[in-house]
């Protein structure tokens, strides 16, 4: 049982770390491409900015789902119930 709990803690740490890393890389690419597009066509910068914020919101939703899964493994681990039964 301790092995399952320790591996669950490691899995939660990996999930949270990869969520943070993926979001950081995604925002870096998104911001870089926005700046490239705004520098190339300055008259389209407001429209690109609106689209960038929409994509940024969607980009934030993915790690939130990962954090929910990590919290599930932390507080309501489904694998512990299988060991007890």
Curated annotation (Swiss-Prot):
Q: Which residues cross the membrane?
A: 10-30, 53-73
- What name has this protein been given in UniProt? ATP synthase subunit c
The record's HAMAP family line, in alphabetical order, gives: ATP_synth_c_bact (MF_01396)
Topology in the lipid bilayer is annotated as:
Multi-pass membrane protein
KW ATP-binding (keyword) present: no
Site (described: Reversibly protonated during proton transport): 60
Q: Which family does it belong to?
A: Belongs to the ATPase C chain family.
Which compartments does it reside in?
Answer: Cell inner membrane
Q: How does it assemble?
A: F-type ATPases have 2 components, F(1) - the catalytic core - and F(0) - the membrane proton channel. F(1) has five subunits: alpha(3), beta(3), gamma(1), delta(1), epsilon(1). F(0) has three main subunits: a(1), b(2) and c(10-14). The alpha and beta chains form an alternating ring which encloses part of the gamma chain. F(1) is attached to F(0) by a central stalk formed by the gamma and epsilon chains, while a peripheral stalk is formed by the delta and b chains.
Protein task: F(1)F(0) ATP synthase produces ATP from ADP in the presence of a proton or sodium gradient. F-type ATPases consist of two structural domains, F(1) containing the extramembraneous catalytic core and F(0) containing the membrane proton channel, linked together by a central stalk and a peripheral stalk. During catalysis, ATP synthesis in the catalytic domain of F(1) is coupled via a rotary mechanism of the central stalk subunits to proton translocation.
Keyword annotations: ATP synthesis, Cell inner membrane, Cell membrane, CF(0), Hydrogen ion transport, Ion transport, Lipid-binding, Membrane, Transmembrane, Transmembrane helix, Transport
Q: Which residues form the signal peptide?
A: none
Q: Name one GO molecular function term.
A: proton-transporting ATP synthase activity, rotational mechanism
Q: Which GO terms describe its cellular component?
A: plasma membrane; proton-transporting ATP synthase complex; proton-transporting two-sector ATPase complex, proton-transporting domain
